[in-house]
């Protein structure tokens, strides 16, 4: 990568809008890991901040990086005692108490908000009996800045005092995750409004049909000089329909590929990796879960392979551990899953011991394909169809899609597993080569990203 800013970026602040504020998804952590390392390599003296609900977990996973909450009073201030301790002991020790605090806050916060709103209603009823006069409808721009500054003062100040804002990769710009999509779009548009360079990397966009969300995306995305996409099957056309100039769009592949690339093994594995994602955005009937488990256990016996339960998400809404471990019970000698607070490279390395992967989780497929391992993708929604088909397109194959609501699931899933097993040796080199190409494309996009700040610095020098 290029020379970077003078003095190694000292005095500059890079704000990362993280795609998962609890840091409980190893795919998101992998993208964050790659992004932080690239920024530190380019600008070793710059200050890096990550939007989060747990500054302690940010410090545990990334010592020296600031965790910034939406309510931070001094977002770029020095880390506190808890964060310094978390950085010293790491995620395995800091993780359990940090998540306990997050869960307690998640339970208390909505109740506190309801009490506040009731008190506000009571005060407003007693304050005046006059009929309120209709006010002119304010524009979106007039609403956005005051709303962010009032509701999320820490985020607003972090943006205003940043040198560059980067929205981390993810699949959140979609109808399946409207609250998070709105949060990210607001932050990016606010950054543009206060004159701070902003960009998006590693994005998987869509399906996006909600009229309100499309309008918000049109307003925000068209202002960005760079949007890097992880797939080309849907994203470029969707962005074009939103009025985003093609000159701002580049297809790179997923940024997490680089992390998996770095843990590749010389020899192929002989195990079957498995993860079943069951969530509101990925519903799976109980009968389908039973069929998946029985099929996997039969495949392990047929190929004399061990089943490897793989965990990518440990969020309350996507508890992969709870939905995956039952699938391997009853199989001969299953592999132990990773612990609850490991680093993403440990998950990618465990994927590397497999000959094939059967997964309902997107980033496990990224980890597998990047190491030359074919994938059977389990899907029940258009959202996951797009994710897996986008990967198949970027890697030139290596993915077989199986629909969990298919009436013939008990026939189609075993056939897909056998086909993936049979082709594993033949596709290994080609999949790895496609992964290497995508890493290069991702790094080139980061060169453009770095240029946003470096050009601004030169112009104002």
Model-based region annotation:
Residues 1-461:
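Active-site anion-handling motifs in enzyme catalytic cores
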């Amino acid at each position: 990568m290029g020379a970077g800013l003078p003095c190694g970026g000292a005095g500059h602040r890079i704000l990362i809008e993280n795609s998962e504020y609890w840091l409980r998804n190893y795919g998101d952590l992998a993208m964050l890991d790659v992004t932080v390392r690239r920024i530190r390599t380019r600008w070793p003296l710059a200050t890096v901040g990550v939007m989060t609900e747990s500054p302690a977990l940010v410090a545990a996973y990334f010592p020296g990086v600031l965790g910034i909450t939406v309510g931070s009073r001094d977002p770029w201030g020095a880390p506190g005692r808890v964060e310094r301790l978390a950085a010293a002991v790491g995620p395995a020790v800091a993780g359990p108490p940090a998540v306990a605090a997050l869960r307690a806050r998640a339970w208390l916060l909505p109740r506190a908000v309801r009490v506040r709103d009731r008190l506000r209603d009571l005060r407003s009823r007693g304050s005046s009996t006059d009929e309120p006069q209709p006010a002119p409808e304010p524009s979106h721009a007039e609403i956005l800045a005051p709303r962010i500054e009032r509701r999320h003062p820490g985020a607003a100040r972090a943006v205003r005092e940043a040198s560059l804002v980067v929205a981390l990769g993810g699949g959140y710009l979609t109808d399946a995750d409207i609250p998070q999509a709105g949060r990210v779009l607001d932050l990016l548009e606010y950054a543009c409004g206060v004159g701070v360079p902003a960009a998006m990397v590693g994005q998987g966009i869509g399906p996006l049909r909600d009229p309100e969300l499309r309008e918000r995306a049109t307003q925000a995305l068209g202002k960005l000089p760079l949007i890097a996409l992880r797939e080309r099957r849907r994203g470029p056309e969707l962005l074009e329909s939103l009025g985003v100039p093609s000159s701002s769009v580049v297809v790179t592949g997923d940024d997490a590929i680089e992390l998996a690339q770095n843990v590749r093994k010389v020899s192929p594995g002989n195990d079957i990796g498995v993860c079943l994602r069951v969530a509101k955005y990925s519903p799976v009937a109980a009968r389908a879960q039973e069929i998946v488990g029985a099929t996997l256990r039969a495949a392990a016996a047929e190929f004399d392979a061990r089943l490897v339960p793989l965990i990518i998400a440990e969020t309350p809404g996507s508890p992969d551990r709870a939905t995956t471990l039952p699938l391997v019970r009853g199989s001969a000698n299953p592999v132990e899953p990773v612990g609850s607070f490991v680093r993403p490279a440990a998950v990618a390395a465990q994927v590397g011991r497999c000959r094939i992967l059967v997964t309902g989780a997107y980033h496990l497929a990224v980890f597998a394909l990047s190491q030359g391992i074919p994938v059977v993708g389990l899907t029940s929604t258009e959202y996951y169809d797009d994710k897996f088909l986008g990967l198949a397109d970027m890697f030139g194959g290596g993915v077989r899609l199986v629909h969990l609501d298919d009436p013939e699931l008990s026939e189609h899933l075993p056939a897909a597993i056998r086909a993936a097993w049979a082709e594993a040796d033949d596709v290994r080199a080609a999949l790895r080569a496609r992964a290497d190409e995508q890493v290069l494309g991702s790094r080139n996009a980061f060169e453009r990203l770095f240029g946003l700040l470096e050009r601004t610095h030169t112009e104002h020098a």
